[in-house]
């Protein structure tokens, strides 16, 4: 019997799963995590050029999942950025220019689980860099903290509309 059940404190059975790149385990973990959402996917991203992650987010929108992205304002203007394309795919997008760089890289699904790590949502992170990604489930306080931070970033950021000239 778990100690928490005996002591009348809430039980938390956390699971932490790690993925690494190059090699695909980080990307696969992120794709599986984003695809598992039933109600919401909230993404904070410094750089966003990954076609597979963009496709996973667009597929979530198509399934009726609410998807929001806060991206770094300067990086979102890069030639290969998919930020505008995501807005055109139905993702609610905002850009944040409040900091030297908005360097976050995390996803919160359904307000209850978190993916975080060094992995930018880019092709380079997948194929050229040594990166990591962690998925944390069963830790409601951790998820609450990340959701609160996402909401703070969202509220201070500027909306992005679909722009046909920036669709990739």
What are these regions (language model features)?
Residues 1-3:
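Sec-dependent signal peptide recognition
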Residues 9-10:
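N-terminal signal peptide c-region/cleavage motif recognized by signal peptidases
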Residues 14-38:
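Short N-terminal segments immediately surrounding and downstream of signal-peptide cleavage
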Residues 32-92:
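Primarily the HKD phosphodiesterase
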Residues 35, 62, 86-87, 100-102, ...:
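Extracellular/periplasmic catalytic domains that process cell-envelope and extracellular macromolecules
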Residues 42-44, 68-71, 94-95, 107-108, ...:
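Structural recognition of the beta-strand scaffold that forms the well-ordered cores
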Residues 47-51, 73-77, 99-102, 113-114, ...:
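Solvent-exposed loop/turn segments at secondary-structure junctions
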Residues 109, 113-168:
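Signature of lipid phosphatidyltransferase scaffolds
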């Amino acid at each position: 019997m778990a100690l928490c059940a005996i002591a009348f404190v809430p039980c938390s059975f956390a699971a932490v799963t790690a993925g690494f790149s190059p090699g695909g385990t980080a990307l696969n973990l992120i794709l599986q995590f984003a695809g598992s959402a039933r109600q919401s996917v909230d993404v904070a991203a410094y750089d966003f050029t990954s076609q597979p992650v963009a496709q996973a987010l667009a597929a979530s929108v198509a399934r009726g999942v609410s998807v929001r992205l806060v991206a770094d304002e300067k990086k979102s203007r890069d030639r290969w950025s998919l930020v505008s394309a995501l807005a055109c795919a139905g993702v609610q997008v905002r850009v944040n220019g409040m900091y030297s760089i908005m360097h976050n890289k995390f996803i919160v699904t359904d307000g209850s689980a978190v993916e975080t790590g060094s992995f930018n949502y880019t092709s380079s992170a997948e194929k050229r860099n040594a990166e990591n990604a962690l998925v944390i489930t069963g830790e409601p306080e951790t998820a609450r903290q990340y959701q609160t931070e996402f909401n703070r970033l969202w509220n201070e950021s500027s909306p992005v509309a679909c722009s046909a000239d920036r669709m990739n």
